[in-house]
């Protein structure tokens, strides 16, 4: 297999390589900044027999370098911003380390850096493909299709002979292919420049999809929902995300030109999120919310503050989401029952802030001030942005007692 891959890598016919390895796949170090053992070993051993995934990719590029510096496009299609840069950074690090250690020529680094020879285009992909769902499996079994049982891998991921994915799909790629490409636009892929890819990403992440998902996740957990699609049958929750998207987000949306933001939201709210065959949960989407609020809502807040003709006071429901998240951190649902918070790297920091707050408390502003002023979480200091007062008001109403979350939604959406 290794011989075949090297043979392919040495051929000029080999024009592009795509990657879907998750954002973590590009990491060369662990959370403490320590090199992964396989990566450290590869740095020392050189490109001949690498053990790490990125090391193997860098080794194949070294093969192309040794066979006439053949051009190629390295296309990351993982769902993360500026994905091409992440792939480049990992590959470039390998090239530099090998050159520093005398295990590869310095010209190999130049080859990786030559835009005419090796490209790392950005892409934006948007297609929800959750793990194989039992309801879909049952439908297929009724059609007398056998052997569908899913398998849990050693890494606790689920695989099956079938895939349940939404029909809607978007793939936008920076048109940077040094060795040419087929006319994939005929299959619906959109090719454009880097700036436009970035705009599409911002449109999706900051306005048209991700903020709506996060809002539903926070309040879905508080109201006991276990499927995002069911939340769209809830009049208050549906109205909430409609107003966040259309009324508060669209006026300052980043318009990429190749996709219409309003049509994108229309599809999200009327087709994608309500799809019962997409068994996504508010609990899954609520994962790492502290890392998401600054991008998914904070950018809209900043755009209002920077605009000469937009009034920050028109933001009514984004502050409600901020307050809802702080209410969520109490780990008590709207029935007064405890629930388990989704994983989040800041739980040990933010949960103690609200730990002493009980339903019915009213004197809470000073208690939650450390959260309200946290730019890392919200993207802005909510006091400086002029949103702290409304956020505190909402929070007080959300903790007024059992049923207060539903009552607050009814009152304001």
Predicted regions, residues:
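Active-site-adjacent bridging/hinge elements
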Residues: 30-31, 56-66, 178-197, 219-220
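Inter-helical turn/loop segments and adjacent helix faces that build the functional surface
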Residues: 64-74, 94-110, 222-239, 252-256, ...
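Conserved phosphate/anionic-ligand binding catalytic regions in large, soluble enzymes, centered on
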Residues: 79-81, 204-220
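Long, compositionally biased intrinsically disordered regions
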Residues: 244, 270-413
């Amino acid at each position: 297999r290794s011989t075949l891959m090297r043979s392919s890598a040495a051929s000029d016919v080999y024009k592009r390589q795509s990657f879907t390895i998750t954002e973590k796949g590009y990491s060369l170090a662990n959370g403490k900044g320590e090199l992964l053992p396989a990566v450290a070993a590869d740095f020392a051993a050189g490109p001949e027999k690498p053990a790490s995934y990125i090391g193997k990719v860098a080794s194949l590029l070294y093969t192309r370098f040794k066979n006439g510096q053949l051009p190629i496009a390295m296309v990351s299609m993982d769902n993360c911003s500026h994905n091409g840069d992440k792939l480049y950074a990992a590959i470039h690090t390998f090239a530099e380390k090998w050159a520093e250690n005398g295990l590869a020529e310095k010209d190999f680094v130049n080859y990786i850096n030559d835009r005419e020879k090796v490209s790392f285009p950005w892409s934006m992909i948007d297609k929800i493909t959750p793990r194989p769902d039992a309801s879909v499996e049952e439908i297929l079994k009724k059609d007398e299709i056998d052997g569908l049982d899913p398998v849990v891998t050693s890494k606790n991921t689920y695989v099956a002979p079938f895939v349940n994915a939404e029909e809607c799909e978007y793939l936008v790629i920076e048109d940077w292919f040094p060795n040419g490409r087929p006319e994939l636009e005929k299959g619906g892929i959109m090719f454009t420049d880097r700036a436009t890819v970035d705009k599409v990403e911002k449109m999706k992440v900051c306005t048209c999809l991700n903020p709506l998902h996060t809002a539903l996740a926070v309040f879905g957990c508080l109201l006991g929902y276990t499927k995002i699609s069911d939340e769209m049958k809830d009049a208050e929750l549906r109205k909430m995300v409609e107003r966040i998207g259309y009324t508060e987000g669209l006026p300052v949306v980043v318009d990429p030109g190749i996709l219409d933001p309003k049509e994108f939201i229309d599809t999200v709210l009327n087709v994608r999120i309500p799809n019962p065959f997409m068994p996504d949960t508010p609990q899954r989407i609520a994962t790492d919310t502290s890392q998401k609020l600054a991008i998914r809502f904070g950018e809209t807040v900043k755009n209002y503050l920077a605009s000469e003709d937009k009034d920050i006071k028109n933001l009514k429901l984004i502050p409600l989401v901020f307050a809802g998240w702080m209410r969520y951190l109490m780990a008590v649902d709207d029935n007064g029952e405890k629930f388990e918070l989704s994983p989040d790297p800041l739980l040990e920091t933010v949960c103690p802030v609200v730990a002493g707050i009980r339903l019915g408390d009213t004197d809470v502003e000073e208690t939650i001030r450390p959260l309200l002023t946290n730019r890392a979480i919200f993207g802005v200091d909510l006091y400086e942005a002029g949103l702290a007062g409304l956020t505190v008001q909402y929070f007080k109403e959300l903790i007024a007692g059992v049923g207060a979350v539903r009552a607050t939604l009814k009152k304001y959406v």
